[in-house]
Amino acid sequence: MLDLSNPRAFAWMEGELDHLVEEYGVDGFKFDAGDAKFYESGIISFEGDSIPNKHTEYFAKLGLKYPLNEYRASWKMAGLPLAQRLRDKTPDWGDLKQLIPGMIAQGLMGYAYTCPDMIGGGEYQSFLKLDNIDQELVVRSAQVHALMPMMQFSVAPWRVLSPANNEICKKMALLHEKFGDEILALAHRSSKNGEPIVKPMAWFWPDAGYEVIQDQFILGDNLLVAPVLEKDARSRKVVFPEGTWIGDDGSEVVGPATVEIAAPLERLPYFRLQVSR
């Protein structure tokens, strides 16, 4: 175990990373683990009074030197240029429903550059038995990711999905690419004002009771995203705040309203508010 509270150990680790950058042209690093739990059980460190979370902070500080980074565990690093993903998710519908509230919580804590783990679930054993893969879950997971700040595949979709479902995932990746400039602009803005990129409904409408909504979110200022999170569902209710909303399918909804919308497997419902903020 590396004691990063020791400046010599920190410098050694940094040197190892720098070597990979200089010798092999590595662009950046995915810093996995680093959890405080690894520094419990009476471990004695260089900085004698370090609490376990402090070691997580030292680990996170390593990434500040490398513009391309990703973390799962951080401590007191809000507002800094670190990409922060959610903890590993299992491939089940219960964990799928945790992605939106988890992303919102991270943003409100000051971690704007967030990633909802990996599409379909990030546990390393998730895709060892291909016969048990819930293809619908992978597709709906890709749809949740598509309009988040980051989108990350683990298993190759074409390896585990039917051609039709693989095509849906491809379209979601292309949708993410389509919104790339907008998401990047939001990231730049967040670096200046600290606002989350993924916002809860109550951010803009704080007195409407929207704080209980956990299955839809606002990207930026005016894009309402409402993915399907229920197995076998081909429609869902969407809560629209006041204003005129234009859907991905060209439909128009005038809010405030709650509307049941069609959401076949290939559709990620999203709606743009027609008033600029």
Spell out what each predicted region is:
Residues 1-169, 204-205, 220:
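Aromatic- and carboxylate-enriched substrate-binding clefts and catalytic-loop regions
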Residues 61-62, 144-277:
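Carbohydrate-binding surfaces of carbohydrate-active enzymes
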